[in-house]
Every structure is written in structure tokens, then in C-alpha cells.
């Protein structure tokens, strides 16, 4: 049990501790994940990086994870959550969207369109070149990407034409570097 003498002696350290707690409350929360790498843009809106997709980890079948998510603004604020359909389960938002879509009412269909789930893929990558953040070079990160990049990956694995040789872009030794080029065009 603390005595008054101890309380008086420790009052400044208690003040410091309380001040730190107040600072934590005032700080705006960050929702970013330091494990996920993003190609940063320069002041003109352009970005460039070279990455290497890494093979699947031990006990993993494929070197990517497919993730469905919802992100929309409703009457009570923003709803940003991963969809349960990622786990093969029924998702309440997807069920509600289906009901809205099947109503046949165009305004309901528009709501369902705004709330539809979005597909992302995640893979481990090695950053070989990062023009905006050189300190990332040589480090391993998670990389979140969409359908278009996934189609490029599957395109080299299963080429469309006979004269193209299939390649595993996730092969550590014989894979390929992947160049990311982001260009600002007409304000977009």
C-alpha cells in the first residue's frame, strides 16, 4: 500500500505517465500496416519500382492470398471490413446486396453496386528498387494488388500464344522482376 510520502515523491512521474496517456488519446489513429509495401508517387504523381514476387511459404499451396472486402459509406458512417466470403462463409453485406439487386428497383441496384465486394490479392515480395523510398530496397514486404496485376501474373504462367514459354514469376531463381510504373495522366 502506498503512503502519502511515496505519492508525494512520485507525483512528477505520475504526471509524465498521465501526459503520455493523454497524448495517445489525442493522436489520430493510423490504419496503415507497415508490413504492406506501396509504390509511392512523387510530387508530379508518378511512381516507379521494381519488385520480385516470392514463392509460397512453407505449408502454403499458392504464393498469394485472395481477399474480398467491402468499403462504403452508409447512413451511420463508413463500413470497411473484410468479407466473410473470403473464408467461404455467408456474408451479411453480400446477402443484403443480393436482396437489393433482386428487387428490380434501379435505386436499390445502385446501392448494391456501391456496396459490392472488392477483390484484392496479397503476396510476399522483395523490393529491388524503390525510387521514392530507397530504404525499402532489399526488404521483404506484403504487396496488395488487384485483378489487373493478377491477370499479368497468370498470363505469364499460362501464355496465350504457342511461341511463349510458361514461366513461374514466383520462382526465386528463374522468376522475373516486376516493374511498376505509375504515371499521372490528366489529373488522374
What are these model-predicted stretches?
Residues 181-188:
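Short, charged beta-turn/beta-strand-edge "cap" motif at the junction between a beta-strand
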Amino acid at each position: 500500500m502506498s503512503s502519502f510520502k511515496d505519492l508525494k515523491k512520485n507525483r512528477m512521474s505520475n504526471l509524465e505517465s498521465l501526459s503520455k496517456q493523454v497524448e495517445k488519446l489525442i493522436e489520430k489513429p493510423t490504419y496503415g500496416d507497415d508490413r504492406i509495401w506501396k509504390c509511392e508517387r512523387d510530387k508530379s504523381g508518378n511512381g516507379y519500382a521494381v519488385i520480385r514476387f516470392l514463392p509460397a511459404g512453407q505449408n502454403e499451396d499458392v504464393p498469394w492470398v485472395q481477399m474480398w472486402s467491402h468499403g462504403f459509406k452508409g447512413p451511420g458512417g463508413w463500413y470497411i471490413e473484410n468479407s466473410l466470403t473470403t473464408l467461404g462463409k455467408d456474408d451479411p453485406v453480400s446477402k443484403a446486396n443480393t436482396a437489393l439487386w433482386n428487387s428490380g428497383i434501379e435505386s436499390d441496384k445502385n446501392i448494391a453496386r456501391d456496396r459490392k465486394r472488392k477483390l484484392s490479392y496479397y503476396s510476399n515480395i522483395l523490393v529491388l528498387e524503390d525510387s521514392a523510398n530507397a530504404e525499402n530496397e532489399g526488404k521483404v514486404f506484403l504487396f496488395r494488388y488487384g485483378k489487373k496485376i493478377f491477370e499479368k501474373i497468370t498470363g505469364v504462367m499460362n501464355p496465350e500464344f504457342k511461341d511463349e514459354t510458361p514461366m513461374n514469376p514466383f520462382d526465386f531463381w528463374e522468376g522475373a522482376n516486376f516493374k511498376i510504373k505509375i504515371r499521372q495522366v490528366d489529373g488522374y
